[in-house]
Amino acid sequence: MNPERSEYIEIPVLPLRDVVIYPYMVIPLFVGRDKSIKCIEASMNKNKKIMLVTQKEAEIDEPTDNDLFTIGTTASILQMLKLPDGTVKVLVEGLQRAKVKKINNENGYFTAQIQLICTPEITEKEQSILIRTTLNQFENYVKFNKKISPEILNSLNNITNASQLSDMIAIHMPLKLSEKQSILETYNTNERLERLMAIMESEIDLLQVEKRIRNRVKKQMEKSQREYYLNEQMKAIQKELGEMDETLDEHEILKRKITTIKMPKEAQEKMASELHKLKMMSPMSAEATVVRSYIDWMIQIPWNIRSKVKKNLTQAQKILDSDHFGLDKVKERILEYLAVQSRINTVKGPILCLVGPPGVGKTSLGQSIARATGRKYIRMALGGIRDEAEIRGHRRTYIGSMPGKIIQKMAKVGVKNPLFLLDEIDKMSCDIRVDPASALLEVLDPEQNVAFNDHYLEVDYDLSNVMFIATSNSTNIPAPLLDRMEIIRISGYTEFEKLNIAKSYLKPKQIKRNALKSNELTIEDSVVTNIIRYYTREAGVRNLERELSKICRKCVKNLILNKSLKKIKITTDNLHDYLGIKKYDFGKTNYKNQIGQVIGLAWTEVGGELLTIEAACISGKGKLIYTGSLGEVMQESIQAALTVVRSQANKLGIKKNFYEKNDIHVHVPEGATPKDGPSAGIAMCTAIVSCLTGIPVKSDIAMTGEITLRGQILTIGGLKEKLLAAHRGGIKKVLIPYDNEKDLQEIPKTILKGLFVHPVKHIKEVLNLSLENTPYFSSK
């Protein structure tokens, strides 16, 4: 019997994606395509009947008749609702299977001529048997599949039509789209129910296997924690499928690695404990990841691996000389240090701390020492570190914990005796809550670092074989930390030293870096001297290197743009074409002789500096005003200087009561820069005397020294840096404390040759030498 009716019906067609509609099925549909919305509206305007056909490929947005299955379901639109976003929600009820004979696309939506499909009739007895058998099978299926509600079974028990029962069961079965369409295209009720029962039988078998796996896993879980359930279930599945590979146990590999590393006994016991703990854990657990990470760190750390240390001092001296010009005293101290270490075969001893302004070669000197000794070089920048955990590490109780920077660097370098450079040790941040400097005490103390304890490792690590060298711009370091280091000062370079450094190191380096050939660029020595004098004013050579780099870049540009240009020669005449106008004057000061203006000398982290000090006397009520971001010590120096002037007012020809009707204002320009220290005492006193007596101060004289209330001049620090600053600034005469005369032996002769340095004991000598006219008392 042919189930298809002979008559054709014209009806709108709605293409569906990823869903198959059966008869008796009530379902909401969301319609968004313009063509589909027109189809719904056309159906609503007629008899609310529509043909629902599924697309073969859901990804197609504009399907044709070839993209649709030929068998679908006629449906009745129960409800339609237009949504704010322009889409339409419709509630449809499947009515009857139908076959599409011809599709038209003339009115902006699909219509089709269809034939309704009638289900072949079966006897009442046969129908009763099929219903009972199918319901029993579905009930058995529901027992294993907990995702299907038992209430569905109750609703199916009331169905007396076998065809309707088959469609309702198909609705609730987790079938693929192709399987659902195949069941829709099965007209015969007997065949349809048989296919569904076969699918249910297959699903029941799979569910029974899954249940068997779960039961096996639960038995295995009795000896372990429930959190390992997922991993054990995976193992059981692999065992069921026969895909379990017999590979070398990971724990055995780790155990072999640990035995090959010669760890201290404490570390070996800790590793054995952690390995046993890892073995008892599931690899999928979070705790196992933490333990595995810990074991990996312990394996990476160099417990007994050393690099061979060179002990040839002659070779070490050659390396230091080839890498750095000058710095003779620094090199001598380093060679002494290396000589002692080579004899006692250990590095226990003072930790060297190279202190000097930026650009003088502190960091590169550390690299040279590493090369001279054959040690591997590792650098740790301490600038901005403000947490002790950066040094000691975090305890493993914290999520994402890691060893401190010390242990991390040791693991990276791979040997236990590298040269470890602690760069910018004075730039660490400290406050009342955190103090990383205290954590460094254990690292730098030779008596303690044999058992350095990182919070993450939880075992002691021997740092006694590491050669630590620190660098700093100043000695503003916590006293306990400073006490553990030997300070080696690296002062600024002289003009002669800068010239040689530029010729031997900086110029070849910049020519190579900017891809120039040696014969393409010539820079005369006089040009380098002019750059040092007129374009830089620094203790080191960093800005000098920048200016040379600027010349090289411009030369490369000119050579590329001008193909006929083969060589470039830089002379003093064309230097301004490359570097612009001169930034500084050399050999002359910037000031004329003025009343109340004195040039002092300061010593800062970046080297020596000229410090202009101004004083003015104005009508007032005896106030002392000081401005210019002055620190407490400098403010006290001003008060001491004023007291000296008041105590000797008669001798200076100043009225005794000058302070009653006058205010004295002392100012140090560049107010945004903080200034402090006692060494400007004599300069403050000279400026005050000058403004009160009206005698100008000589502009070619600079001075430095602390003053007492008796007018005595006390010693100061940083003499070499201050004299270098005076030389750079074109100062001819410098007044220094008498007790600092012995320090002149440390000053290069090239500097002393261009300066007249006059040691002074008392403020009388200072005033006689620095003022244009001799004060009243000096003639006595």
From Swiss-Prot:
Which factors induce or repress this protein, as stated in its UniProt record?
A: By heat shock.
Q: List the disulfide bonds.
A: none
Record has Nuclease as a keyword: no
Which coarse location class describes where this protein primarily resides? cytoplasm
Where in the sequence is the active site?
Answer: S679, K722
Q: Which CDD domains match?
A: RecA-like_Lon
> Is Nucleotide-binding among the key words of this record?
yes
List, for all copies, the residue spans of the domain called Lon N-terminal: 11-204
Give the UniProt subcellular location, in the record's own words: Cytoplasm
Q: Which residues of this UniProt protein bind ATP?
A: G356, P357, P358, G359, V360, G361, K362, T363
Reading the lineage from the top rank, the first entry is: Bacteria
Q: Which residues form the signal peptide?
A: none
Q: Which UniProt keywords apply?
A: ATP-binding, Cytoplasm, Hydrolase, Nucleotide-binding, Protease, Serine protease, Stress response
InterPro entries on file: AAA+_ATPase, ATPase_AAA_core, Lon_bac, Lon_bac/euk-typ, Lon_lid, Lon_proteolytic, Lon_Prtase, Lon_prtase_N
Q: Where does the record place the Lon proteolytic domain? A: 592-773
State which Enzyme Commission number(s) the record gives.
Answer: 3.4.21.53
- List the record's Gene Ontology CC terms alphabetically: cytoplasm
Instruction: Spell out the reaction equation it catalyses.
Output: Hydrolysis of proteins in presence of ATP
Q: What SMART domains does the database record attribute to this sequence?
A: AAA, LON
Q: Name one Pfam family in it.
A: Lon_lid
GO biological processes: cellular response to heat; protein quality control for misfolded or incompletely synthesized proteins
Q: What does this protein do?
A: ATP-dependent serine protease that mediates the selective degradation of mutant and abnormal proteins as well as certain short-lived regulatory proteins. Required for cellular homeostasis and for survival from DNA damage and developmental changes induced by stress. Degrades polypeptides processively to yield small peptide fragments that are 5 to 10 amino acids long. Binds to DNA in a double-stranded, site-specific manner.
User: What binding partners and quaternary form does the record give?
Assistant: Homohexamer. Organized in a ring with a central cavity.
What the record says about family reads: Belongs to the peptidase S16 family.
Protein name stated in the entry = Lon protease
